[in-house]
Amino acid sequence: MSWDDAIDGVDRDTPGGRMPRGWTVAARLRAANDDITHAAVADTLPAYAELHCLSDFSFLRGASSAEQLFARAHHCGYSALAITDECSLAGIVRGLEASRATGVQLIVGSEFTLVDGTRFVLLVENAHGYPQLCSVITTGRRAAGKGAYRLGRAEVEAHFRDVVPGVFALWLPGDQPQAEQGAWLQRVFAERAFLAVELHREQDDAARLQALQALAQQLGMSALASGDVQMAQRRDRIVQDTLTAIRHTLPLADCGAHLFRNGERHLRPRRALGNIYPHALLQASVELAQRCTFDLSKVQYTYPRELVPQGHTPASYLRQLTEAGMRERWPEGAPAQVVAQIDSELELIAYKGYEAFFLTVQDVVRFARAQGILCQGRGSSANSAVCYALGITAVNPSETRLLMARFLSKERDEPPDIDVDFEHERREEVLQYVYTKYGRERAALAATVICYRGKSAVRDVAKAFGLPPDQIALLANCYGWGNGDTPMEQRIAEAGFDLANPLINKILAVTEHLRDHPRHLSQHVGGFVISDEPLSMLVPVENAAMADRTIIQWDKDDLETMKLLKVDCLALGMLTCIRKTLDLVRGHRGRDYTIATLPGEDAATYKMIQRADTVGVFQIESRAQMAMLPRLKPREFYDLVIEVAIVRPGPIQGDMVHPYLRRRQGYEPVSFPSPGVEEILGRTLGIPLFQEQVMELVIHAGYTDSEADQLRRSMAAWRRGGDMEPHRVRIRELMAGRGYAPEFIDQIFEQIKGFGSYGFPQSHAASFAKLVYASCWLKRHEPAAFACGLLNAQPMGFYSASQIVQDARRGSPERQRVEVLPVDVLHSDWDNILVGGRPWHSDADPGEQPAIRLGLRQVSGLSEKVVERIVAARAQRPFADIGDLCLRAALDEKARLALAEAGALQSMVGNRNAARWAMAGVEARRPLLPGSPAERAVELPAPRAGEEILADYRAVGLSLRQHPMALLRPQMLQRRILGLRELQARRHGSGVHVAGLVTQRQRPATAKGTIFVTLEDEHGMINVIVWSHLAMRRRRALLESRLLAVRGRWERVDGVEHLIAGDLYDLSDLLGEMQLPSRDFH
């Protein structure tokens, strides 16, 4: 069986990501057109509307997407399709889009199973019924944990007591119908209750039909046909069965009655339905569908307005705050062009009705600043002068070129996007403020849809098909990041599987189908939705996994479709690091700075940046960025803006990086075809590096602001299979009409297409560059405080605590070395702290850098509560001995062992062996007989150097002793393996043999299978480039080594040093049990 045969019939998205939903629908519509032949007799078939259908948002139940379901319904000639996911509207917006694309009417509904077993579907009839359905779902979801719901009859009755229901109820009788269930539903919904007859050829359908019709007549309840649809087509049954097995955590072979007996729960052709149901029941479904007139797109949303004080309108209050912010930002008066820009923006904001949204974001930022929480806006909102005046963003509009259309325009039919970063350790305070301010009834986080990826899908599928755990692990590894461009067939074969095995083929085929299939809802990283009325009237709300969090059932794409505004409160670790560093500098060094008041354009800082001495700083710490820095040689702030943006897939794939560097280095002349283009591209030497520049170029050519924004969207869509050809034709015509040469037009368009692979807006890059400069200045001038703050902000960033400490201790020609003291129970707090040194007095008298005392937070297995007890007891009086420590700090066995293994007791008892012995005999209480003689101390020999280093890494994650490679250096010399110092003395192009600890593996999407590896020895980091053919040949050594040896060619060009690997092999055996952290494929 071939690979293509195995996945025949399995829908696959285009490579590189999912297409926009509308295009996905269109593609599947075309596929369905090929699948179903429309005959002239179609009009004579019975009409039908499917009123009970689950999509893939009935997680692990429905096998098909809304797009697939509507495409199928369209070609079967259905008049309507109800999406009735179980106690959920999570997939309903996708249903709306699919309905628009196909013309098949969408009916909004949901399926429920009550605690007593009663099953029914609610369908929305009108605008009154929609909030009723949302409220029922919310009640059920809020009464249970994440991913579950709980509803009883009392809760349902309470929602419809004393109100006219705006919904219809379809009773779903079981195999043994209980008339009392139907009677109860009829009491609640009266004539709006119906009996759904669902026939699936699983038993005697004729007998069941007769029994259900008699039951309906007995109850005085109308009956209609429905399908309990769980898949678009019959061939999807294997996927539905697999999802059932995953849901029940059973192998398929053990699922038994959990599986459907056949594939009848698909959208069946009307001819088949006409042979199964009486035409009257089919017609009843159509008639009920016609009564469901609710249009989801007409849902009204009102933003909260309580922030507006009495006597003000939202517009007048926003203007007042903006003008006050202008006076604060520009004490001497704002420039005339800024005033004009702000007036223009306020007029546009009022026209779009977004004043309350801006006021909300400003209020959240105001709260954070009042609490001392660092925050900063980013993204396209940094194009707004109003956002700058309000203190939301940090990019001064008088110092940069703004393009408001990138953020908001009159023609743009979608909400503005304002992203604000907060310290990652304190963002929860901000989220809880929003909940408190607006109430949990009116505020909730947006959802994120967690979808299957290759690795997670194959794990679940293989388990469902009964593969043993060891084989599942092998198969899952075939989908790992490190496989590069190795064909899947080769990966499978190398893992020891036979592609001719039908079981393996079936697992792989189902896995392919489940790629991007929704698995569950999670919470968005920080997107808040706030409403003037209870959110549960607008969209169902459910509990998140985290305590004190609630989420709505729609994700950010749904919100955009429904034109709902969200406030993005995001978490950024570097803000935590900078705030902690500034606190340390203020408290220990006597320098009171904020990000805004740090000395600007500091030559020493830029000199450090040019040497790529940027471990731990913001954004420019990655391998690719560090390789760019010596070539670009930033000398001013705008260079940092370019640096942030240039190492992105868009500029790389658009072939903008090398031309820019050649022009910057003087190897290529800079020219412009017109003054208009020079005005747009002058600062980037004629090369478009930012999204705003692309939009400005086409506006210059004749596009409107709205058309330019549509081009931006098309650029992103092009990467996922969209069509850029209409834009190519129009841009060519417009620019040719302005006299531009065809070569220039083609070059510009190719660069435009490159932005489809992700390019930064300049506003976003400028916002990030502020933090780049701040972190670099602190690293250069306050290296101890910066390293300490960085350690205290972990986990974050690219580098482990070990690498941060190694870098601080090593120093550089541009930066002082920092002394680091070990963890010590007599001196360490929870956090790492600064000790010693002398305060800063002036640039002429900068004082002396302090040392860092490692904190007890670095100790594996030691909780913060235990450390709080240790510090509190130590503050009362010094510890007399180990027994006193254990007694007064109430240390349990786990804490005692953690302290001993970490070497945190050496100042009390000597070496690590002595500490282990002492802790082994201690209890956290005094002896029963106070006069009992103390046990005689035993003198134990100190561990060997290698044992100490191994224990350090195991217990603390780092070592202040010799670097492991220093211990191994004699063996390296025997093998003629060089260290970094010897390597740096070699000429460009030399053949070399090196080895080091693996600290990073990266495979950028633009690298065509090339893997970049960072090795570390006692002198620093070695950057290794592994071409795809070698990565495939030496995959195991490349991906599994802790200590990797490389033979290759040493290269040094424009200050950038790296090793081109010719061969590599694993030396991890030399490390013994030592486990070292490596940051792989992030």
Curated annotation (Swiss-Prot):
Keyword Lyase listed: no
GO CC field: cytoplasm
CDD domains assigned to the protein according to its UniProt record, in alphabetical order: DnaE_OBF, PHP_PolIIIA_DnaE2
Pfam families in the cross-refs: DNA_pol3_alpha, DNA_pol3_finger, HHH_6, PHP, tRNA_anti-codon
NCBIfam families per record: polc, PRK05672.1
UniProt GO BP: DNA repair; DNA replication
Keyword field: Cytoplasm, DNA damage, DNA repair, DNA replication, DNA-directed DNA polymerase, Nucleotidyltransferase, Transferase
Protein family per UniProt: Belongs to the DNA polymerase type-C family. DnaE2 subfamily.
Example of a GO MF term: 3'-5' exonuclease activity
Name of the molecule in the record: Error-prone DNA polymerase
Biological function: DNA polymerase involved in damage-induced mutagenesis and translesion synthesis (TLS). It is not the major replicative DNA polymerase.
InterPro entries, per the entry: DNA_pol3_alpha_NTPase_dom, DNA_pol3_finger, DnaE2, DnaE2/DnaE/PolC, DNAPol_HHH, NA-bd_OB_tRNA, PHP_dom, Pol/His_phosphatase_N
